[in-house]
């Protein structure tokens, strides 16, 4: 028998709609870093927790995203795998829109922020 998973999906700009997971139940999770809101659904019998990075109403600007609360909430819900989508721009003409990129460098401006 295949073990059922608890999967977290973090959607960025352009990936705010989780309707593919059927009927969704909103959840608010309390964390030491503040509240995180997500939607719970199912897919192929697995529990899916959809977290909209910019909020369910897309009202949170990038510099105000509470990343620590979001990740803590998924951990608290028992999520063991996370699939995260994001959309960014590029100044490199060799990377036209629609190019799939795996990053090897990261500038993290979220340190020491609650």
Where in this protein do the model-derived segments appear?
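Metabolite-binding pocket within alpha/beta catalytic cores that recognizes anionic/polar moieties
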Residues: 2-114
